[in-house]
């Protein structure tokens, strides 16, 4: 029996190693042209006198792209890593307790989410002084054009769900960059700063049954966003009902971005996607333009109970969650992704209130923020 099992394992391993190669040579079972990587697949290189030096590398790229059963093998590897070894097949994702996924934050800019968590990317005193000076200047420039500026900072998922982080990372640092920036700006400037960390952490601690961030995604869910937007609304002299006073229904589950990074988006689907209702009787109409990072959303609320001020929300993807709750509070609300913001947007919208929103991992974008742009040139 034991010998038969060993032979079975050996045959399985041989099939895994040799079947894709045999199919590749025979030209059968080629991978589909559409991949999760969203790029053009490598073409078969030509072996010529002028290309013989680079041919091996080019052929390797072609082989990797067109290997038969590639997608199935990638899926199998990711599934085994996640389900049985509680590890990640991607350097962009770590697997935490109870199957929770966390983003390592290294895809763009100087994101360093694990350094945020461990407090390893603190600013120096000089850097804080420079940052405060820049933001003071930005607020003054907006004020000259009749717009009051508010900053709102939202915590990383690992900050709120530290209880689900891998044990190897330990507890989150007591002092970390977001906390450092907020404390410095509040102590040394008159800027309006809203930090939603404490209100979200307190809610999670007292209400473990209500999930406020997605398990398989980098983002908070709609309910978590509602809690945070309630705090922002107070800073804008508006108010939203208590989280305990609203209704929550389970909505359509999105494709979770961290699950997609592991090629497991088709099986990691059991993750609450709450829809919040009952917080207002007011409605709004919206128009959306652009896609992805180029998205802009314009909302208008005709209710006489809506604030007559025009609001411009400049932010990252977390801001899109906040938009729907703000859109019923103001007569006109516009969301603009930070990468698309420039002075022309301000001149076109002519808001009385401007909110610059960032999730913790994007905090370094503060160094680039001005009335002219919110993204490095």
Model-derived regions, located:
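Extracellular glycan-modifying ectodomains
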Residues: 1-377
């Amino acid at each position: 029996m034991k010998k038969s099992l060993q032979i079975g394992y050996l045959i399985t391993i041989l099939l895994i190693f040799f079947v894709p190669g045999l199919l590749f040579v025979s030209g059968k079972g080629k991978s589909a042209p559409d991949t999760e990587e969203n790029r053009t697949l490598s073409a078969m290189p030509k072996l010529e006198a002028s290309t013989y030096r680079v041919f091996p590398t080019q052929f390797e790229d072609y082989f990797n792209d067109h290997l038969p059963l590639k997608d199935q093998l990638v899926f199998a590897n990711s599934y085994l890593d996640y389900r049985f070894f509680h590890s990640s097949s991607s350097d962009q994702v770590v697997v935490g307790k109870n199957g929770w996924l966390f983003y390592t934050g290294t895809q763009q800019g100087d994101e360093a989410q694990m350094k945020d968590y461990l407090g390893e990317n603190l600013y120096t005193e000089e850097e804080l002084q420079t940052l405060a000076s820049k933001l003071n200047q930005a607020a003054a420039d907006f004020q000259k054009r009749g717009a009051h500026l508010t900053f709102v900072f939202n915590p990383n998922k690992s900050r709120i769900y530290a209880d689900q982080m891998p044990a190897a990372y330990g507890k989150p640092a007591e002092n970390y960059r977001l906390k450092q920036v907020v404390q410095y700006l509040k102590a040394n400037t008159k800027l309006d700063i809203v930090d939603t960390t404490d209100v979200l952490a307190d809610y999670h601690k007292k209400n473990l049954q209500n999930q406020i961030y997605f398990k398989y995604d980098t983002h908070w869910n709609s309910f978590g966003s509602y809690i945070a937007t309630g705090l922002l609304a107070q800073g804008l002299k508006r108010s939203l009902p208590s989280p305990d006073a609203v209704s929550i229904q389970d909505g359509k589950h999105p494709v979770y971005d961290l699950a997609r990074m592991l090629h497991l988006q088709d099986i990691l689907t059991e993750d609450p996607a709450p829809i919040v209702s009952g917080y207002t009787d007011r409605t709004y109409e919206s128009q959306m333009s652009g896609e992805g990072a180029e998205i802009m959303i314009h909302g208008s609320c005709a209710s006489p109970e809506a604030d007559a001020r025009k609001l411009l929300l400049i932010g990252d993807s977390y801001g899109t969650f906040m938009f729907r709750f703000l859109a019923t509070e103001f007569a006109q609300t516009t969301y603009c992704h930070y990468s698309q913001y420039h002075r022309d947007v301000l001149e076109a919208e002519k808001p009385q209130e401007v909110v610059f929103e960032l999730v913790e991992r994007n905090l370094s974008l503060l160094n680039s923020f001005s009335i002219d742009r919110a993204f490095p040139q």
